[in-house]
Structure formats: C-alpha cells, structure tokens
Amino acid sequence: MHRLILALVLLLFASPALAAEPLTLSSPEHVLSVQVSTDGDGRASYSVNRFGRPVILPSKLGFLLTDAPKFDRNLQTADAGRRSADDTWEQPWGERRFIRNRFNELRVALTETGGLKRRIDVVFRLYDDGVGFRYEVPEQPNLKSMRIAEELTEFVLAERGEAWWNTAFEWDREEYLYNRTPITEVGQAQTPMTVRYASGLHLSIHEAALVDYAAMNLTRVEGNRFKAALTPGITEAKVVRNTPFTTPWRTIEIADRAGGLYESNLILNLNEPNRLGDVSWVHPGKFVGVWWDMHLDNKTWGSGQRHGATTAEAMRYIDFAATHHIQGVLVEGWNKGWDGEWFGNGADFSFTEPYPDFDLEKVAAYAKSKGVRLVGHHETGANAAHYESQMEAGFALYHRLGVETVKTGYVSDALGARVNGDDGKVHYAWHESQSMAEHHLKVVETAARYHIAIDTHEPIKDTGLRRTYPNWVSREGSRGQEYNAWGQPGNPPEHEATLVFTRMLEGPMDFTPGIFRMKTRSPDGVPTTLAKQLALYVVLYSPVQMAADRIENYLANPKPFKFIEDVPVDWAESHVLNGEVGDFVTMVRKDRHSADWYLGAISDGHGRVLQASLGFLEPGRKYRAEIYRDGDSADWKINPYDIVIESREVTSSDVLQLRLAAGGGQAIRFVAEGGKGRR
C-alpha cells in the first residue's frame, strides 16, 4: 500500500500538466468560445465551441524541428495576458468601405517543464464569426532560431459533413477544379478549405498574414482529424526563422450559412494596418486588353506575323477604352522574351525592351492623351531570381511612362519556381514556399516605391495582406476564364458559384469575366449565358476588373455591354442575399461613389428561380432597376445569347423573382432617384 501511495505521489509531481486548469476565452457576444488545455503527457491542445456546441474538438499544437527536439510534450500552460478591442477602420478600396474589428484575445504561454525549457506563446483572437490563432516565439537562450520541419497544428472537425477543397502539392498551383467530397474523403487540401457540417454549419479553414513563412495546407490524418502541412522549402527545413518571430494566423471562419463566410472580415482584421501611408495613387478600375485573342490562338504573345502586341493594335484598344469609359488597356506580349520555351523558364524575358513592332513610348503617350491608363505586364515564367535582377528597372520604366498597375505572371512547368538561395545559387521552389512568400512581398514593396499596384497571376495565395500593402490589389489563384478558351475540359457551370465560397474567401480574384462570344477552342466553349457573364461583375470581386473579350464582340452587342460600362469596381457595402456552395449565389453591392446598388445572381447547370428582397435599398427612396436577365429560352448549351434588357421602378419593400436559366444569371443596376449617378 505504501509503495502504491508513493508511486501516485511521484506520478503527480512528474506530471504538472495534470493539475493545470483549462484556459478559456469567449467572443464579444459569447457566440464562440475556445479552451486551451494539456493532457497527461503535457501535450497542449485547443478546442472551439459555438453556443456551447463543439465545432473543433481538442486539436494539438506544436512544432517538429530539424535541428532540435520537437516542441509538443511536457508543456505547461499559463495565462500570459488578455485584451479586447473594438474599433472600425476604413479600406482605401474594397468590397466594403468600413470594417469593424471587435475581438477578445488570450495569450497562452507554453513552456517546457524540463529539458531546454523553451517557451512559445499561442495567441488566440476570438471574433463572433471566427477564430484566429498564431504562434509567437520570443528570443531566448535555448531558442535563437527555428528550423521548422512541420507544424503539429491540428484541426479536428466536430461533425460529419462535406468539404470543398483544392488538391495540395500539385504542380499547376491553384488552377484546378474544386473537389466536393465527404470530409472523410479529403486527401491533401490547399486552404481555404470550405466545410458544411451535417447540421448546416459552415466553416472555412485558412490563414492570415502569410509573411516570411511557408503556406499552410491540410492533410487529413484519419477520420475528421486534419493537421497542418507546410509547403516544402529549398532545404530540409520548410521554414527557417530567427527569434523573435510570429507565424501566420491560423483561421477558422464559422457561419450558419455559406454567405456568412464571404461576409466575414476575419482575414483582413488579422492583418496589420496599412504600412504604405497615402495610397491615393492606387486607382481601382476596369480594363480591356490584348489578351483573349492569344488564348483563342488568333494571335501570339511571341513575335511574328500574328504578334498581338503591336503599336496599332494597342492604339485601337485605347480608342475603344476612351470611347466606352473603360479606364485601362492591358497589352501582353509587348516585351522581348516570348519566343521559344519561355514557359517555366523566363530567363530570356526583358522587362524594359519592347519588340520592334511595339513602340512602348508612343503607346503610353497615346493612352495618356486619351485619358486611358496603360496596364503593364511582367510575365516571369516563374523565374523569380531573373525577375528580381530586372524588376527595379522595369518598375522605374513603367513609372516614368505613367503606368499605375502591373499584372505579373508566374507560369511554370512541373519543376516550379526559380529562386535565389542563401548559398548564392538558384534553386527550384514551390510556388507557396517561404522563398516565394519573400519574393512576392519584395515585388509588392518595390512596386510601392514607384506608386505601382500589383495584380499577381499564378500567385501565392491571398491571406489578407492587401490591408498592410494596399497596392497588392488582386490575384488570380483560380482556374480562371482562360480555361474556357482552350481547356480540355473548360470550367463547368457550377464553377463560379463554387469560387465565391472557396477561393474568394481569400480576397480579390482576377477571373477575367465579360465574354460575349461563347464559342472557343474548348469543347463546351464558355458554359454560361450572356446574362451570367454580366452578373459575374457583381458576384466576383476585384478592384481591377477586366472586360476580357475581343472588342469586336462588344461593338456587336452595345446594349448588354452598357452594363459593363456602368458597373463600378469599388464598393461601400457587399452582402450575400442567398447562396449555396457550387449551386447558386445572389450578391448585392453598393457603389462607393454614388447611391446606386448592383445585384448579380448566378446559377450552376440547373435553372432556378430565386427571391431577392430589396430591403438593402434606402427606405423611402425610389430606384430605377435596369435589369439584364436570361430570356425565356436561354440555356448555356443551346441558346446562351437570349437576353432581355428591361427596367422598372422599385423600392426597398419590393421582392424580385429572379429567373435564372441553366448556366444563367441576372444583373441589375438600381439607379437611385435624385442621385448623382455615375459615368
């Protein structure tokens, strides 16, 4: 008996974590709560409840290191501080002008009880619609640096359900169709991953403020248990950092409905405020460009008889833009380096030397004389090392010519991107590696010095850094419209309704809508109706929005093109009236510079009728609804061009019945009576 008592006493003293009380935190309105605890081995975990119901079951925390013992056991927890905040900040541009930042925060110190006695803090920030947490590593004698092989962060989902996810660790970046599977059939997923529980609750797991760190993916380990899977680096360590440092925030948005995920400001709020100061030089706007013709194989990026980027062609597009109140013109293929194997190479690109048949100085001057902004283009072939050697000169040239926005590209082959290593050599790297995270931020910071905004294609994923760097205006990061030009297959009709609740939870998306001629090189062409192409300007958000078709197709259809002329790209408010992931969505947005509202509704491959209550309009005010809807015989397969354009008077008390064809949509401009309107 004495031996048993002695053994129990020794066990209690050897396991101090057993006596630790869980630490808890609630959101401002007590919607969400988080609990942090340790088990008998001193392993720390967190869990999340919503109105007392489990959302995330106990999920482990910690790190696996390449040059030191892993940090995951013999830990004790301590409350290292709490704080709350409730403030409102203004976006210089965006899908909504004012954003409330209201949260409660808990800092948990995780300290080893023996051995190296290292300490890593985990900071939990709890909003009513989501939770963010990150590791903060202080400088300490036994932890001067960290070589991270993997995070041991887990997300154990509390219910069965289904998930929408993009496969991780594929060579073609994010340009894949989303999988829709039961949670238990997810493999390796990129984030954001969207989940709908059987109870109807919606979740999105992602990250915020990805700076000098590898992007996080998710690996399903078993059942509903997921663990973080960092993107590999150019050495055995996926992340190398000196202390002190912080990781990106790990985020979980939580909402009753799919639309609540899109309406959440969690990702933006977790990023640092604007570091650039006055950014009045960042100008949202629409643009046309020498682009779609190349995807249709009518013209080429490289030199020759079919070269698209000629002086004459650029000036023709500038004339069109000036006549139709389009702010910018993009010209791709203007610079030397497109001939030969540029795909995944990029070493031959010059960012200052135009082809002989493109007079850059003349085109820029002509655009300025017409009140049109030239949109620059830097395709890198994912050769980040080569681009960094020239980008300063490239931005300086563009700045001198009055270019305010540059579209960058990182098209690569299966070998990935090329980056400079600390050893002075060029290495291949994943697009979302720590090296590429550093590269993209270097591009954005360099561009800012020249008052240039960046629209990144084939990008690293968006994690809300546009708040900190407002010149990072948009990214592609999805299977965009070009796949409808040549894809085998193209994008299916449900694609855009999926993107709203998956990719668009990251931030602005340059999808390039506005195709008016649906026949392409792809077997199904563009699988939408004409009305849906118009609706995409409201449904899909980007502050730099392209009217992507050939201008001949716009000249042949002036009445529907008027909606593209009228629709703004900078908003005061944005709301999802209804929607289900991959099925349909109705979005309304208020123009930042007038009293007008805009509505966009889209459907998948099924026709449907949606109700749209106009309660978002100002009470007591009349509006003229300019409606662009599918005709009675519209169908994306057999009659995509059947469109009806009509108008009626409405008020906030009205409810509209929106009839959407298969693959269809509806776009509406609500012009306020007595408002100043727009041009």
Please provide the spans of the model-predicted regions.
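N-terminal signal peptide c-region/cleavage motif recognized by signal peptidases
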Residues: 14-15
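Edge strands and adjacent loops of beta-rich recognition modules
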Residues: 89-102, 561-587
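An acidic-aromatic substrate-binding cleft motif
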Residues: 242-324, 328
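Catalytic cores of secreted or luminal carbohydrate-active enzymes
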Residues: 531-577
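Carbohydrate-binding surface patches
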Residues: 581-623, 666-667
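C-terminal beta-strand-rich structural cap/linker in extracellular carbohydrate-active enzymes
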Residues: 647-679
